[in-house]
Regions:
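ATP-dependent small-molecule kinase phosphotransfer cores
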Residues: 1-43
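Generic structural signal of hydrophobic/aromatic residues within well-ordered alpha-helices
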Residues: 3, 21, 30-37, 70, ...
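Generic secondary-structure transition motif, activating predominantly at the C-termini of alpha-helices
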Residues: 25, 38, 74, 78, ...
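ATP-dependent NMP and nucleoside kinases share a basic, alpha-helical "lid"
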Residues: 31-83
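Small-molecule kinase domains that catalyze NTP-dependent phosphoryl transfer to phosphate-bearing small molecules
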Residues: 51-52, 76-138
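Glycine-rich loops and low-complexity Gly/Arg-rich segments
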Residues: 68-73, 84-89, 143-147, 256-259
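Transition-metal
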Residues: 116-121, 125-266
Length: 266
């Protein structure tokens, strides 16, 4: 019910949620959980979304996952947070994530940067990896000062062609590839090498943790901790005609979707 206004009745379009994780927390139950922990004589593990609101404890671990991996898990039947919508239309799952869950999670994550002791890469199921807070911070600080690229991902679509399949050495069993998301920090990830071990973080971590260093003062002052450019490539070779891309004016996108800026394509 609390999300109804932002979810809307539309299959794809929603409205941005600008609240916080605490908006969905029952204060009485939170206090009850905190009191239970205080009463315990032995070690207690608190886990789950917003566990840090209950207690930071002696060791605070943040579990991280890129949004592309989240989308892939939606397709495999994973539900949105705290909702039994396992079989729901993937576009509706994505809408709930894009307009509500990811906004809340980003705000919560920003507050966690100075609190957690370790970060866990959960992008590969049953193969988690962990780094310390210091390693996390040093890595992102260094990255903000040098050239880098995000991990691309490819997806089929209505107009999809065959060119990327050959040039990028992609799965030949796929019917086509329409999209190559090559520089969309909100959804792409970044790979780090630590003594031969590959560690994956959402590229949004860099945007949120080092926004001024990454974007520059002028861009940051206009857009805040968001990456306002999306680099993606479309393949129609031996495919269908590209769909007509229509983007609203700034006033319209603010009024109807709660978004602070629009986009143009070239």
């Amino acid at each position: 019910e609390q999300m109804k206004y932002n979810l809307t009745d539309d299959r794809v379009f929603g409205k941005m949620y600008y609240g916080n994780l605490v908006d969905f927390i029952d204060e009485d139950k939170l206090e009850e959980a905190q009191n239970k922990i205080k009463e315990q004589k032995e070690s207690v593990i608190v886990y789950g979304v917003g566990a840090g609101l209950v207690s930071h404890g002696d060791v605070y671990v943040y579990f991280d996952m890129a949004r592309w991996e989240i989308q892939l898990r939606y397709r495999k039947g994973m539900a949105n947070y705290n909702v039994d919508n396992y079989d729901e239309d993937i576009l509706k799952k994505y809408k709930r994530g894009y307009f509500i869950e990811w906004r809340i999670a980003d705000k919560h994550k920003e507050k966690c940067f100075e609190c957690f002791d370790y970060v866990v890469d959960t992008n590969k199921s049953k193969d988690p990896k962990m780094i310390s807070k210091d390693t996390f911070k040093i890595s992102l600080h260094q990255l903000s000062k040098q050239p880098f690229r995000t991990v691309p991902y490819f997806d089929p679509g209505v107009w999809g062609g065959q060119w990327m399949k050959e040039v990028c050495n992609l799965d030949k069993d796929q019917s086509n590839y329409a999209w190559s998301f090559d520089g969309v920090p909100e959804e792409n990830s970044i790979l780090f090498d630590y003594d031969g071990i590959t560690f994956e973080l959402p590229a949004m971590d860099l945007v949120l943790y080092q926004p001024k260093e990454l974007l520059g003062e002028q861009v940051y002052s206009r857009f805040g901790a968001e990456f306002p450019i999306r680099f993606d490539f479309l393949d129609t070779m031996e495919g269908q005609n590209l769909s007509l891309q229509v983007h609203p004016l700034t006033e319209y996108i603010k009024k109807n979707f709660g978004m602070s800026y629009t986009q143009d394509e070239s």
